[in-house]
Each structure stands twice: as C-alpha cells, then as structure tokens.
Amino acid sequence: IKIEELQDGFLLDKQSLYDEMVRLLLDEGSAKDAFEFSERSRGRNFIDMLGSQKIQPGSEVDKAALEREEKLRATVETLGRRFAAAQPAEKQKLQDELADARRNYTQFIIGLRADNPQLSSFVSVPTMDLASLQKLLDAETKLVVYHVLPDELVAWVIGPESFNVVRTKVKRTEIVDVLGTYRRHLQRFDNISTEERMLSGWLIAPAESLLTGAKRVGIIPHRELHQMPFSATRLGNGYIIDKLALFYAPSASVIQYTFDRRKAHNKSEKVLAIGNPNLGSKSLDLPFAEKEASRIKWSFPDATVVTGSQATETWVAKNIGEYGIIHIASHGEYNEHLPLLSAVKLAPDSEDNGDLTTRKIFGLSIKADLIALSACQTGLGKVGNGDDIVGLNRAFVYAGTHEILSSLWRVDDVATAVLIKYFYRNMAGRDRAEALRQAQLEVRSQYRHPAYWAGLFLSGDWQ
C-alpha cells in the first residue's frame, strides 16, 4: 500500500493487535513485557510509511547500507513467492534457499543495529529493553511512558532503579475530545481551567507520587498525546514546571540514539541563527523573527546571523553541518496528510524552492547539539494509527542533532522572543531541560496564559 491515507487504515488492525497484547500482558502482571511491546509498536507506522517513500540518506555509507538491505529483503520476498507457488519437487530446494536468505537478512539487520541504530530503525522495528533504558537515567531523572488504549490510559514511570505502571480508566475518545477542546481554547486565549483539570487528572495526578525525588521528567507520548503541552499540566497546587524540568522523546530508542550520537560527535562551538527568510510576500514577514535571530548575538557574540534573501534553502543545506547550535526563526508548514512534505520555510533561489521539507532533512548531515525551530507548529507530525510521529523533529534527529526545541502551535512573536532570550541565557551552567523550564517561568511571570509559554518543548535528550 503506497498511499498514506490507505496505509493508516491498513495499519489499524496491526495496531489493535499491539493494543490487545499490551492489555493482555498488563492483565497477567507482566508490566515489563507490556512496556517493551509498547516500545516496539511505536516504530511500526514510521517504518511502513517510509516504505512508500524514497528517502535519500545524507552519507554514502547510509545509502550503501539501505541499498544492501533492500537487495537482501527483495531476495527473501522473491524466494518466498517462488516457494508459495512451487511444485512439491521444488519446495525442499527453495525452502533451503529461503532459510539461507532469511539468515543473511537477519545477520545484516543485527549488524546494522549495532553499527547504526538510527538507520536500522528505517527498516526494522528497534527494541529498547528496560534494563538498557534505566542505565541511561541518572538519580534525578525519570521517564513517563504513555500508551493510549481504547478504554484506558497506561503510564509506565521509570527511574534508574524503579519501574511502576499506572492504569487509568478513561476512553481514548474522551481524551481526544477534551484535548481537542483544550487546544482550541488555548490558541484563542480562552479559559481552559476545566480541560486543564481533566487532562492533568488523567495524565499526571495518577503518577504524581512516583515522581518524588526527580528534578526532570522525560515524557514519551502516545498517539494524540504528542499534541499535549505537558508543561501546562497541573502538579499539586501549581504547574508541573514549578517543580520539574521536562523533555520529550518519540520513543525510548530515540533517547538511546541521541546519547550515542552525542558521544560520537566532535562538538562544534559555532552558532548559526536564521531569521525571517524572504518568502516573496510582505504578508509573510516576521519582523520579530529577524530581531530574534539578531539577538542571538547577545548570548553568542560570534554567531553567524543570516536573514532575508540570504537565508536560502540552498545556503542552509550546504552550511548547516558546520554548526553546533542552529536557531531557525521562520514560518513552518505542517502537512497533516503528507508529513514528509512538512517544511521549514526558507528563501527560494534559482536552485531550490525554499521548502526545507522533512524528506530533504533526512538527507542532510548535521552535527549540532541543538536545533531551535522557532516557527509555527514545527513540532507537530502526523500521528496515525501507528505512533512514531513523522515530523521535522524525527528528521533532524536522524540527520544528526541531539536536541530539538520546537513548537506545538502558532506561538506569539513577542513571547517567543522573550522565551528564547532567557533560554539561551539560562543554558550557562544548566542542562537544557532546566534552561527551558526557567525560561518558561520567566515568560509566565509576564504572560500568564499557557498559550504564551507552553507551546515550546525540548525533544531528544536533556543534557
């Protein structure tokens, strides 16, 4: 199935099987196995969707690996079809050939997972066992991993030496309805107290006692919860960010990958700020975005600042690999139906149309510790019947960055500029999750409504 809308329907039965398996394992008291099964389910939609697209990896090594995988997989599929249609006299020979082909493919995938785990996630569902995940966490960090079932919400709360599961009876349809109302009211700056209380009661309150001792919490959402601004949830008598710094990841496997890439990279101290690219229409100008980019020099005096007609897609694609911190203040375009065409809008020129799409980002080679996407809805991706969110964030992680700061909705220009200023200022001596928390508190002291400060979130690892 090549068309994504049809493909999501095709995956519905697969995902319902994952759901039933998670529920069955939980009912049997096998919370650890249920978690690991949930983790496997997160990558399935991403892999199947990419199977319908031609992604061009950034390095020749990656291209060669994908070509090798495709050749080995095609051999398995061809022999499988021949075996199914073979006469009895031919079946034994074909069965042996098929067994050899499957063995070769399996050995290749095992090697690819060891050498290049992120690339392997394009062709096989990665597995992240609990013990390996816990080794990544320090004493002040916990994870909350969600799985939305049709009639309950599951949350695993994981620390370096702790593992608990919380099950809350609430229908998925109710979560979807309340979250939709909440986001509409939020973006209109309306009263959100009722929806805020309901969502916090489902998402945070049941796990509150299990977060004791943590200074930061990693959120791994599921399905529609990717669209939830967790920094605006309630904890006790205040917001969760009054006590805890937050970071996000689409899956536990992505956290492992960002840690591994951080170790492998030679860190660059160079900073690039891109602001208000010339998109050919005055109506698309973002004056505060240009100021925002220029003010990066307040925190990083040697930063390269590129704005207006100079901020072309061609220039960015050619030079982005040189920088350790990259800040892009521009429009973002979220394509719900074709997520690989979601884009950061840059200036067009004679070589490129200016749309730095998800598809194109997969082909870049980036060595940045941090990419900040100060644009409209850059953090959103398509959440289908599978879960692994396909958006700009995942593409930038694959291309090489460890952390992405991005937005869930159209964020107010002035409030964003203030938040970004404090975020970079707070990075000195703090991890980035804490730097963002402090920046959100600063903005909240001036602009009380969560629409001003809860839209930006940090995805990847927290360091």
Whereabouts are the PLM-identified features?
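Boundary/activation segment at the start of structured domains
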Residues: 161-164, 170, 180, 222-288, ...
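Residue-level detector of buried hydrophobic side-chain packing
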Residues: 41, 144, 155, 217-219, ...
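Amphipathic alpha-helical protein-protein interaction segments
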Residues: 1-239, 263-278
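Active-site-proximal beta-strand/loop segments in catalytic clefts of secreted hydrolases
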Residues: 146-148, 220-223, 249-250, 274-278, ...
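An often Trp-containing, charged/polar helix-loop segment at the C-terminal end
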Residues: 414-463
